[in-house]
Amino acid sequence: MNSTTVSRFLLENKTIIAMAMICSFVIILNACTTDADEGFDTASVCPSEGTNIYGMPNRGTFVDERDGQEYRYTTIGNQVWMAQSLNYEATGSFCYDSLPKNCEKYGRLYRGENLDHLCPAGWRMPKSNDYENLLITVDNRMDVLSTGYWENIQDTIYINKCGMSLRAGGFAYLTESRNENNDVSFWTNESDGSDYFFTFYVCYNYMSISSLGHSIETMKYYIRCIKE
C-alpha cells in the first residue's frame, strides 16, 4: 500500500469503529432518559391523511417504471420521502450478505458513484440539507424508525409515527456486510470536495450527517429518494 491508500484505510476503519461506539454510548444514555415524544404533534408534522404540496395523498405508493417495483412514500413537513429504501438493481449494487431476502427487507446497498441516475423518474437523490431539514422537522425524534428491525429497542417505544420506516440494514465495507440490526446509513449526492460524500447515519436513538470516512469507492450504503 502507498501512503495515500494507508491513510484512507485508517480513516475508513476509524469511521467504522466510531459508528459502533456511538451506538453503544447512545444505548446506555437512552436507558437513563425518558421518552422524548411529549408534545410532538404527529398530525401536523407527518399527517397520514390529506394531500401534500404536490397534490398527492400524504401517504401512498408509486411504481418505478424501470422495473415495475412498487414503493411506499410518506409526507414529513414539506418533504415527500420514499418510505422504503431503493431496490433498483444498478451495476455494482447488492443485497446485505448477498441474500435476496435482505433486498426485500432493506433495499440494495450501493457504491457512491453515479448517484444522480439511480432514483426513479420524479424523484431525486437527497442533499445533506434535505436530511438536515428532516431532522429539524421531526425534532431529531425517532418517529421515523420501523419497529421490529432494531436491536435493543422496544417495539412499544417507537411506533414509526411518521411512516418513514427506517430499518437497521447496516452497511457494507468493500463486500463485507456489517451492523445489521444496529444502524443504517444512506447516501446523499453531495461531496465534501473530495471522493468522500455526506451520508445520513441512524443508530437507535441518534441521527447525524457526516462525510468523515465515507468513500464512494469502498463504502456501500442505502438510498432514500426524495420527491422532486
Where are these regions (language model features)?
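Sec-dependent signal peptide recognition
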Residues: 15-22
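N-terminal secretory signal peptides that target proteins for export/translocation
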Residues: 1-12
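C-terminal motif of bacterial Sec signal peptides marking the signal peptidase cleavage site
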Residues: 28-31
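Hydrophobic alpha-helical segments with strong N-terminal bias
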Residues: 14-15, 95
